[in-house]
Amino acid sequence: MNMNEFKGVIEGLLFASGDEGVTAKQLSKILDIGLDTVEHILEELRFEYEREDRGLMIIQSNNIFHLATKPEHSSYFKRLIDSPRTSKMSQAALETLAIIAYRQPITRAEIDEIRGVRSERPVQTLITRNLIEETGRKDTVGRPVLFQTSKEFLTFFGLATLDDLPPLPENIDPDKEEREADLFFERFQDEV
């Protein structure tokens, strides 16, 4: 790969790492190139974002690099967040919501384990739509955030309490459990 290709991959990895970010050392290991080269590419990217009046910037905090939006554009991002939602919720968000509804309080790592994939974006979507909320921290190593459904979740789905959720049969295989949850949430997919 040439330097421009590495630059493109690093840019993509910064985007894919989301809020967690990525260290130069991780990038070096992933790309199998020297740390000095990675740091040089990161500086080039940072300079390009600043020089070209782009909407993004690279920030560094505690040796972790993040791709972020520029603060001077924040009024536009607020408008986007405040605008009425016309988009449907993704299948990943519906699966995540079902897991949280039936297993709450639950950490994102536990959700990831059940789904078999990372759930950072679906969790963020559900928080943005006020369907879930943070409820504290689990008393374990790292003290991860616990999530639960919100009052808006109950209102939206026409439930008085969580006890009104359709019961999941005992001794159900995981595939069938997912289908049962999908059936419940499927009728709301177009509305959410």
Curated annotation (Swiss-Prot):
GO terms for biological process: cell division; chromosome separation; DNA replication. Keywords: Cell cycle, Cell division, Chromosome partition, Cytoplasm. Gene3D superfamilies: Winged helix-like DNA-binding domain superfamily/Winged helix DNA-binding domain. It comes from the Bacteria. InterPro entries: ScpB_csome_segregation (IPR005234), WH-like_DNA-bd_sf (IPR036388), WH_DNA-bd_sf (IPR036390). It is found in: Cytoplasm. One of its GO terms (cellular component) is cytoplasm. Disulfide bonds: none annotated. Participates in chromosomal partition during cell division. May act via the formation of a condensin-like complex containing Smc and ScpA that pull DNA away from mid-cell into both cell halves. Homodimer. Homodimerization may be required to stabilize the binding of ScpA to the Smc head domains. Component of a cohesin-like complex composed of ScpA, ScpB and the Smc homodimer, in which ScpA and ScpB bind to the head domain of Smc. The presence of the three proteins is required for the association of the complex with DNA. Belongs to the ScpB family. This is Segregation and condensation protein B. It comes from Oceanobacillus iheyensis (strain DSM 14371 / CIP 107618 / JCM 11309 / KCTC 3954 / HTE831).
